[in-house]
Amino acid sequence: YDAHEHIIIITSLQKSIKEKILEKLQISEKDFLSCDLIFTASEQAKIIGSEGEFLASKNLDNKAGCHAIMNAFVHTNHNRNKVIVFFDNEEIGSLTSRGANSKLLTEVLERIDHALNLEKEEHLIKLNKSFNISMDGAHGTHPGYIEKHDPNYQIALGKGITIKSNANFKYATTANGYAKLKLLAMKNNI
């Protein structure tokens, strides 16, 4: 946030946001310690394009990804343990206590295995056999701004999934994970 470049929310010339909250909650200032207050756009998602082929919405990558993962999770029939996690704070680097870079998932999985009376070695073997996918949206190549995209990686809209990778491991993709995803896509004609 840069105070010189970003808009400060103004809700009233008479009362501050804090005063409005106190009034709405009917509490005194001494009972108000702190809060996380997030403002967001309230526009509904819209189908756009001359053929109605585009969906325009805020946070679309996260919503579409979460929906696809949840749908697959619910409709997959096998007896293996399945875990899905939807982390918060992806847009700010996942560095919060509830973000993907936190200890939350590690601690939850350890507690589950502890409750199942698994030894530490059994827990580690289970983790080693697991497969992790980090889901995010990839920016499609805009025909009006070709120069803004890497010429070696043109991402076509509506042509399937994109697997992101980075030599500095900016993404969760490994060579093994890439191969598994590619085989899954080929097996399912994606």
Predicted regions and their residues:
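N-terminal hydrophobic/helix-forming segments and targeting peptides
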Residues: 1-190
